[in-house]
Amino acid sequence: MISSNDFRTGTSIEIDGAVWRVVEFLHVKPGKGSAFVRTKLKSVKNGSVVEKTFRAGEMLPQALLEKSSLQHTYMEGDDYVFMDMSSYEETRLTAAQIGDSRKYLKEGMEVNVVSWNDTPLEVELPNSVVLEIKETDPGVKGDTATGGTKPAILETGAQVMVPLFLSIGEKIKVDTRNDSYLGREN
Protein backbone atom coordinates (compact mmCIF):
# COMPACT_ATOMS: atom_id res chain seq x y z
CA MET A 1 0.00 0.00 0.00
CA ILE A 2 1.15 3.52 -0.76
CA SER A 3 -0.19 6.82 0.50
CA SER A 4 -1.32 9.44 -2.01
CA ASN A 5 1.07 11.81 -0.17
CA ASP A 6 3.98 9.64 -1.36
CA PHE A 7 3.14 9.85 -5.08
CA ARG A 8 6.07 10.72 -7.33
CA THR A 9 6.37 10.79 -11.09
CA GLY A 10 6.73 7.18 -12.20
CA THR A 11 5.00 5.63 -9.17
CA SER A 12 2.88 2.62 -10.19
CA ILE A 13 -0.49 2.03 -8.53
CA GLU A 14 -3.27 -0.49 -8.98
CA ILE A 15 -6.85 0.74 -9.46
CA ASP A 16 -9.71 -1.65 -10.32
CA GLY A 17 -7.32 -4.41 -11.36
CA ALA A 18 -5.36 -2.22 -13.78
CA VAL A 19 -1.87 -0.75 -13.46
CA TRP A 20 -1.50 3.03 -13.72
CA ARG A 21 1.68 5.12 -13.64
CA VAL A 22 1.70 8.64 -12.15
CA VAL A 23 2.67 11.11 -14.90
CA GLU A 24 1.95 14.35 -12.99
CA PHE A 25 0.89 15.08 -9.44
CA LEU A 26 0.03 18.18 -7.44
CA HIS A 27 -0.59 18.39 -3.69
CA VAL A 28 -3.37 20.94 -3.12
CA LYS A 29 -4.09 22.45 0.31
CA PRO A 30 -7.14 24.71 -0.05
CA GLY A 31 -7.84 27.35 2.59
CA LYS A 32 -11.13 25.69 3.37
CA GLY A 33 -11.62 21.93 3.34
CA SER A 34 -9.20 19.04 3.37
CA ALA A 35 -6.06 18.61 1.30
CA PHE A 36 -6.06 16.44 -1.81
CA VAL A 37 -3.72 15.19 -4.53
CA ARG A 38 -4.58 15.90 -8.17
CA THR A 39 -2.90 13.44 -10.56
CA LYS A 40 -2.59 12.48 -14.20
CA LEU A 41 -2.36 8.71 -14.53
CA LYS A 42 -1.24 6.77 -17.59
CA SER A 43 -2.47 3.24 -18.18
CA VAL A 44 0.52 0.94 -18.53
CA LYS A 45 -1.58 -1.46 -20.60
CA ASN A 46 -2.98 0.83 -23.31
CA GLY A 47 -1.34 4.23 -22.79
CA SER A 48 -4.53 6.21 -22.10
CA VAL A 49 -4.18 9.17 -19.72
CA VAL A 50 -6.82 10.12 -17.14
CA GLU A 51 -7.01 12.78 -14.44
CA LYS A 52 -7.90 11.53 -10.98
CA THR A 53 -8.10 13.21 -7.58
CA PHE A 54 -7.29 11.44 -4.30
CA ARG A 55 -7.75 12.56 -0.70
CA ALA A 56 -4.47 13.40 1.04
CA GLY A 57 -3.23 10.31 2.84
CA GLU A 58 -5.53 7.93 0.94
CA MET A 59 -3.99 4.46 0.82
CA LEU A 60 -3.84 2.64 -2.53
CA PRO A 61 -2.33 -0.69 -3.55
CA GLN A 62 1.07 -0.19 -5.14
CA ALA A 63 1.62 -2.23 -8.30
CA LEU A 64 4.77 -4.27 -8.00
CA LEU A 65 6.30 -4.23 -11.45
CA GLU A 66 9.17 -6.53 -12.36
CA LYS A 67 11.87 -5.48 -14.80
CA SER A 68 13.82 -8.07 -16.72
CA SER A 69 16.65 -7.48 -19.14
CA LEU A 70 15.84 -9.17 -22.44
CA GLN A 71 17.31 -9.12 -25.95
CA HIS A 72 15.15 -8.42 -29.02
CA THR A 73 15.90 -11.42 -31.22
CA TYR A 74 13.47 -11.29 -34.15
CA MET A 75 9.98 -10.43 -35.40
CA GLU A 76 7.33 -12.98 -36.24
CA GLY A 77 4.39 -11.38 -38.04
CA ASP A 78 3.36 -8.43 -35.86
CA ASP A 79 4.93 -9.92 -32.73
CA TYR A 80 8.28 -8.85 -31.34
CA VAL A 81 10.18 -11.77 -29.81
CA PHE A 82 12.53 -11.17 -26.87
CA MET A 83 14.85 -13.68 -25.21
CA ASP A 84 16.16 -13.90 -21.67
CA MET A 85 19.86 -14.54 -22.34
CA SER A 86 20.36 -16.50 -19.09
CA SER A 87 17.42 -18.93 -19.35
CA TYR A 88 16.81 -18.70 -23.14
CA GLU A 89 13.11 -18.22 -22.43
CA GLU A 90 11.20 -16.31 -25.13
CA THR A 91 8.70 -13.51 -24.48
CA ARG A 92 6.38 -12.14 -27.17
CA LEU A 93 5.00 -8.62 -27.26
CA THR A 94 2.63 -7.07 -29.78
CA ALA A 95 3.28 -3.79 -31.58
CA ALA A 96 0.55 -2.20 -29.42
CA GLN A 97 2.33 -3.26 -26.21
CA ILE A 98 5.63 -1.81 -27.43
CA GLY A 99 4.05 1.44 -28.64
CA ASP A 100 6.38 4.25 -29.74
CA SER A 101 9.44 2.34 -28.53
CA ARG A 102 9.40 0.27 -31.72
CA LYS A 103 10.82 3.13 -33.79
CA TYR A 104 14.19 2.62 -32.06
CA LEU A 105 14.05 -1.15 -31.58
CA LYS A 106 16.43 -3.25 -33.66
CA GLU A 107 17.41 -6.90 -33.52
CA GLY A 108 20.07 -7.74 -30.95
CA MET A 109 19.23 -4.74 -28.73
CA GLU A 110 19.06 -5.26 -24.95
CA VAL A 111 15.95 -3.69 -23.37
CA ASN A 112 14.06 -3.86 -20.07
CA VAL A 113 10.65 -5.51 -20.29
CA VAL A 114 8.28 -4.43 -17.51
CA SER A 115 5.92 -7.18 -16.27
CA TRP A 116 3.06 -7.28 -13.79
CA ASN A 117 1.70 -10.63 -12.53
CA ASP A 118 3.92 -12.39 -15.11
CA THR A 119 2.26 -10.44 -17.95
CA PRO A 120 4.63 -8.29 -20.05
CA LEU A 121 3.31 -4.72 -20.23
CA GLU A 122 5.87 -2.47 -21.89
CA VAL A 123 9.42 -2.09 -23.14
CA GLU A 124 11.90 0.39 -21.65
CA LEU A 125 14.62 1.37 -24.11
CA PRO A 126 18.09 2.56 -23.14
CA ASN A 127 18.29 6.38 -22.90
CA SER A 128 20.33 6.51 -26.10
CA VAL A 129 20.84 4.23 -29.10
CA VAL A 130 23.27 4.19 -32.02
CA LEU A 131 21.59 3.95 -35.42
CA GLU A 132 22.63 4.39 -39.05
CA ILE A 133 21.19 7.11 -41.29
CA LYS A 134 19.40 5.48 -44.25
CA GLU A 135 17.87 8.54 -45.90
CA THR A 136 18.60 12.28 -45.74
CA ASP A 137 19.08 15.23 -48.06
CA PRO A 138 22.66 16.04 -48.99
CA GLY A 139 24.14 18.93 -47.03
CA VAL A 140 25.39 21.71 -49.27
CA LYS A 141 28.37 23.71 -48.05
CA GLY A 142 27.40 27.28 -47.21
CA ASP A 143 23.71 26.45 -46.67
CA THR A 144 23.46 28.50 -43.48
CA ALA A 145 25.52 30.90 -41.45
CA THR A 146 24.60 29.12 -38.22
CA GLY A 147 24.01 25.46 -37.46
CA GLY A 148 20.89 24.23 -39.25
CA THR A 149 19.15 20.89 -39.19
CA LYS A 150 17.48 18.57 -41.68
CA PRO A 151 15.28 15.48 -41.31
CA ALA A 152 16.92 12.05 -41.47
CA ILE A 153 15.33 8.60 -41.58
CA LEU A 154 17.22 5.98 -39.57
CA GLU A 155 17.62 2.23 -40.14
CA THR A 156 14.61 1.47 -37.91
CA GLY A 157 12.35 3.95 -39.71
CA ALA A 158 12.55 6.63 -37.01
CA GLN A 159 12.84 10.23 -38.17
CA VAL A 160 15.04 12.72 -36.30
CA MET A 161 16.44 16.16 -37.03
CA VAL A 162 20.21 16.07 -37.62
CA PRO A 163 22.87 18.69 -38.46
CA LEU A 164 23.39 19.53 -42.15
CA PHE A 165 26.89 17.98 -42.33
CA LEU A 166 25.66 14.40 -41.78
CA SER A 167 25.14 12.08 -44.75
CA ILE A 168 23.70 8.65 -45.56
CA GLY A 169 25.52 5.71 -43.96
CA GLU A 170 26.83 7.58 -40.91
CA LYS A 171 26.08 6.24 -37.43
CA ILE A 172 24.59 8.68 -34.93
CA LYS A 173 23.59 8.56 -31.27
CA VAL A 174 19.93 9.43 -30.62
CA ASP A 175 18.15 10.20 -27.32
CA THR A 176 15.14 7.83 -27.18
CA ARG A 177 13.27 9.97 -24.62
CA ASN A 178 12.89 13.07 -26.80
CA ASP A 179 13.97 11.95 -30.32
CA SER A 180 16.96 14.30 -30.39
CA TYR A 181 20.36 13.95 -32.06
CA LEU A 182 23.18 13.55 -29.51
CA GLY A 183 26.25 13.16 -31.73
CA ARG A 184 28.21 11.11 -34.22
CA GLU A 185 29.28 7.59 -33.40
CA ASN A 186 32.40 5.99 -34.87
Curated annotation (Swiss-Prot):
The keyword Cell inner membrane does not apply. InterPro entries: Elong-fact-P_C (IPR015365), NA-bd_OB-fold (IPR012340), Rib_uL2_dom2 (IPR014722), Transl_elong_fac_P/YeiP (IPR020599), Transl_elong_KOW-like (IPR013185), Transl_elong_P/YeiP_cen (IPR001059), Transl_elong_P/YeiP_CS (IPR013852), Transl_elongation_fac_P (IPR011768). Pathway: Protein biosynthesis; polypeptide chain elongation. GO terms for molecular function: translation elongation factor activity. It comes from the Bacteria. GO terms for biological process: peptide biosynthetic process. The keyword Protein biosynthesis applies. SUPFAM superfamilies: Nucleic acid-binding proteins, Translation proteins SH3-like domain. Keywords: Cytoplasm, Elongation factor, Protein biosynthesis. It is found in: Cytoplasm. One of its GO terms (cellular component) is cytoplasm. Belongs to the elongation factor P family. PANTHER family: ELONGATION FACTOR P (PTHR30053), ELONGATION FACTOR P (EF-P) FAMILY PROTEIN (PTHR30053:SF12). Involved in peptide bond synthesis. Stimulates efficient translation and peptide-bond synthesis on native or reconstituted 70S ribosomes in vitro. Probably functions indirectly by altering the affinity of the ribosome for aminoacyl-tRNA, thus increasing their reactivity as acceptors for peptidyl transferase. This is Elongation factor P. It comes from Synechococcus sp. (strain CC9902). The gene is efp.
